[in-house]
């Protein structure tokens, strides 16, 4: 746990009692702050109270009695409709931050590296932490991924904090000092929360405002918004390391054919690393290589560490093989852009998709429909996706994940196509049937692993 002694004796409201909010409340209580916490969900309030966190309805409290409001980034505070407490806090001029800001204030001298982008953040964060650790550096990874910011351990002076930062967290952070800031890509996502694409890009761009003098901005240049940001950073005189998987870069890190190139010179063959399949993972590896080089590691050290990466759950995770069929859990793929990165890796796909649809649907994936043997539709998006697939891809309406798994297994075993893959890559949020994409992926894994125990097809 990170100590936040600067808030001793302060009166702090904590809004949201998920992972980050609960960790924040615990850290504040340990520091001697006066904490009042709230969550609109009854179950979260009950869990917080059982953990010893004081629960108070903030609507009944005069906000001029508080010194700070710590906001859980998953709760809207501006768009599409701000939470009433956010509006009251602004009217009362009550400072509003997230837990990452408290981490930055608590550890102003710590070496921090940040990763953001629409897709690939979690893999890049864990891969970078893995490389630093393999090369002998004390490291802790968290933030939007895994461990909440204030649940991270305190590291020795040569330690590195690798932080995955969402656009929501970047909006509520002000004091970070970063040695490396990575922006992988920017494609439409969470637009409702940011008032449109311009607001979303502005939130992502903020990561570079926190670079210390001499710090490195590592930026993917394979999309228009990121190329525009690179041009802006160049004008500001910020050190930029460009990465690409679309073309060879004479200056930068690239891997258009799967061989990682440093200023166009070969370093290692990413295609030989099973845990990093596909161009999207090559982009992640390029970003990690660039960041690790900025931290002083040698190409040989980095290449050796990349080769030992075990992979990350719910990101093209191989969860089983049955009758020669590979079962891939890509539950993290909640939009079409993320799904595309998985589809291009396989030729004979039995595709499980659906859930709570996001803007844009799956029409953009039509160029890859030839890879799909059959689609199995679940959740709220079933009819919308059926309309897109009709006449182009054979599909079955399955309603639920367990029925989709059974149907996919039956058909894939019957077809007996060499190299067949059953791919859970939903192109949707999970909240219509699951609590999170992790819950959805874990359920898929359990269903597949039940095959070994004689589970019914």
Swiss-Prot record:
One of its GO terms (cellular component) is cytoplasm. Its EC number is 6.3.2.9. The keyword ATP-binding applies. It comes from the Bacteria. Pathway: Cell wall biogenesis; peptidoglycan biosynthesis. SUPFAM superfamilies: MurCD N-terminal domain (SSF51984), MurD-like peptide ligases, catalytic domain (SSF53623), MurD-like peptide ligases, peptide-binding domain (SSF53244). One of its GO terms (molecular function) is tetrahydrofolylpolyglutamate synthase activity. NCBIfam families: murD (TIGR01087). Belongs to the MurCDEF family. This is UDP-N-acetylmuramoylalanine--D-glutamate ligase. It comes from Paramagnetospirillum magneticum (strain ATCC 700264 / AMB-1) (Magnetospirillum magneticum). The gene is murD.
């Amino acid at each position: 746990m990170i100590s936040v002694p600067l808030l001793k004796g302060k009166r702090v409201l904590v809004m949201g009692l998920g992972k980050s909010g609960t960790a924040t409340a615990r850290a504040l209580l340990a520091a001697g702050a006066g904490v009042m916490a709230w969550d609109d969900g009854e179950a979260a309030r009950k869990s917080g109270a059982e953990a010893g966190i004081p629960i108070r309805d903030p609507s009944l409290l005069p906000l001029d009695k508080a010194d700070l409001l710590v906001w859980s980034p998953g709760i809207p505070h501006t768009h599409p409709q701000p939470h009433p407490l956010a509006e009251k806090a602004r009217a009362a001029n009550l400072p509003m931050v997230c837990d990452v800001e408290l981490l930055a204030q608590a550890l102003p001298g710590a070496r921090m590296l940040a990763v953001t982008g629409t897709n690939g953040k979690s893999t890049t964060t864990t891969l970078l932490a893995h490389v630093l650790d393999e090369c002998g550096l004390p490291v802790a990874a968290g933030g939007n991924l895994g461990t909440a910011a204030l649940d991270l351990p305190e590291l020795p002076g040569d330690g590195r904090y690798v932080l995955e930062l969402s656009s929501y967290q970047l909006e509520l952070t002000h004091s970070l000092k970063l040695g490396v800031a990575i922006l992988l890509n920017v494609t439409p996502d969470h637009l409702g929360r940011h008032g449109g694409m311009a607001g979303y890009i502005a939130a992502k761009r903020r990561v570079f405002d926190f670079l210390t003098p001499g710090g490195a901005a590592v930026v993917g240049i394979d999309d228009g918004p990121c190329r525009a940001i690179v041009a802006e950073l160049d004008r500001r005189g910020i050190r930029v390391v460009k990465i690409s998987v679309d073309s060879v870069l004479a200056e930068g890190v690239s891997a258009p054919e799967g061989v990682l190139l440093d200023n166009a010179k070969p370093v290692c063959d990413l295609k030989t690393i099973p845990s990093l399949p596909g161009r999207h993972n090559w982009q992640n590896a390029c970003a990690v290589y660039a960041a690790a080089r900025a931290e002083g590691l040698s190409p040989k050290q980095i290449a050796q560490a990349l080769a030992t990466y075990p992979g990350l759950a719910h990101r093209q995770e191989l969860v089983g093989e049955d009758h020669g069929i590979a079962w891939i859990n890509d539950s993290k793929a909640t939009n079409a852009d993320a799904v595309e990165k998985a589809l291009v890796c396989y030729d004979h796909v039995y595709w499980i998709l659906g859930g709570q649809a996001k803007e844009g649907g799956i029409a953009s994936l039509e160029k890859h429909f030839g890879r799909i043997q059959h689609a199995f539709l679940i959740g709220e998006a079933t009819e919308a996706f059926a309309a897109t697939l009709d006449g182009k891809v054979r599909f079955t309406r399955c309603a639920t994940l367990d029925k989709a798994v059974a149907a996919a297994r039956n058909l894939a075993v019957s077809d007996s196509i060499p190299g067949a893959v059953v791919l859970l890559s939903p192109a949707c949020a999970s909240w219509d049937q699951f609590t999170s994409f992790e819950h959805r992926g874990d359920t898929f894994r359990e269903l597949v692993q039940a095959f070994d125990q004689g589970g019914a097809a």
